[in-house]
Design a protein with these regions (language model features):
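N-terminal nucleotide-binding beta1-loop-alpha1 segment
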Residues: 1-18
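Hydrophobic targeting segments
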Residues: 2-7, 42, 51, 248
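Short glycine-enriched, charge-decorated loop/helix-capping segments at active-site entrances
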Residues: 20-26, 72, 210
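A short, N-terminal amphipathic alpha-helix
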Residues: 31-50, 67, 226
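Short, high-confidence coil segments that cap the C-terminus of an alpha-helix
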Residues: 48, 94-96, 123-126, 229
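Short phosphate-binding loop-to-helix
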Residues: 58-116
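Conserved alpha/beta core of the MobA/IspD/sugar-nucleotide pyrophosphorylase nucleotidyltransferase superfamily
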Residues: 94, 168, 182-262
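Conserved core of the sugar-phosphate nucleotidyltransferase
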Residues: 109-208
Length: 262
């Protein structure tokens, strides 16, 4: 099977304009942009046949080309990263069987998380897979802090007994009681913004209408669920590492703190 990896990157963002070009301090003490850190992660995935950045902004294109990334320009009218990845596939003459959508807001994603995601897609009848993490007390506390501060941050997910996603939300789901927090027991799973698609599912995505829930939550993956297409969740392990996403400028020091421990 041939595999394409696409990093969708847009400059305009209501919460964090210019996020792909945001800089933070890496584990070696040097400043690196979010998009270059994500590209370096992609380069470690040797089983991927081709890797590209898909953007609609010339600033991102020129910056990515400066560190050797291959870039394709996409329409400015696309609504989200999945639509951008689907257009990138079309620009590659649709000659790939599996497509990985590696969004640039998770530079701490371990490579084995992406490997496991693709393995699950290949061996199963699923059309879309995505990784999730059981929240530990520290990450759950950060989710609650973001919520109480009115920041739209990480995404949580609930799923059925077969690990098919039931719902994704920017709210904290399921409801977590104070007793759960105190006893170190919670059932909250953090969604990592990476997807693997069978080509036919991704091609279908741009033809599907945006549903109410997708618009309300601002979560692109809900388009699949609202159109009765399953998303298989793959429970991931950090193997002792820590994880956090870069959704807001306030996340930069959190990620830098984690990187200093690596």
């Amino acid at each position: 099977m041939s595999i394409l990896l696409v990093i969708p990157a847009r400059y305009e963002s209501s919460r964090f304009p210019g996020k792909p070009l945001a800089f933070f301090e890496d584990s070696n003490g040097k400043k690196i942009s979010l998009i270059e850190k994500t590209w370096k992660l992609a380069l470690k995935l040797n089983f991927i046949d081709k890797k590209i950045v898909a953007t609609d902004d010339i600033r991102i294109k020129e910056f990515c080309e400066s560190f050797g990334a291959e870039v394709c320009m996409t329409s400015k009218d696309l609504k989200n990263g999945s639509e951008r990845v689907a257009e990138a596939l079309k620009l590659q003459d649709e000659r790939y069987d599996i497509i990985v959508n590696l969004q640039g807001d998770a530079p701490l994603t371990p490579i084995w998380v992406i490997e496991d995601l693709v393995k699950e897609l290949i061996k199963s009848n699923n059309k879309v897979t995505t990784p999730i993490l059981k929240c530990d007390q520290e990450s759950l506390k950060k989710l609650i802090i973001d919520k109480n501060a009115g920041r739209v941050g990480a995404t949580t997910v609930v799923f059925d007994k077969n690990l098919n996603a039931l719902y994704f939300s920017k709210e904290l789901i399921p409801h977590t009681r104070q007793s759960d927090l105190k006893s170190n027991k919670n059932f909250v799973y953090h969604h990592i913004g990476v997807y693997a698609y069978k080509a036919e599912a991704l091609k279908l995505y741009n033809r599907l209408p945006q549903g109410f829930l997708e618009k309300q939550e601002g979560l692109e993956q809900l388009r699949f669920l609202e159109n009765d297409i399953n998303i298989k969740c793959v429970i991931s392990s950090l193997r002792g590492n820590q994880f956090w996403e870069l959704n807001n400028p306030s996340d930069i020091p959190i990620i830098e703190k984690i990187l200093k421990k690596i």
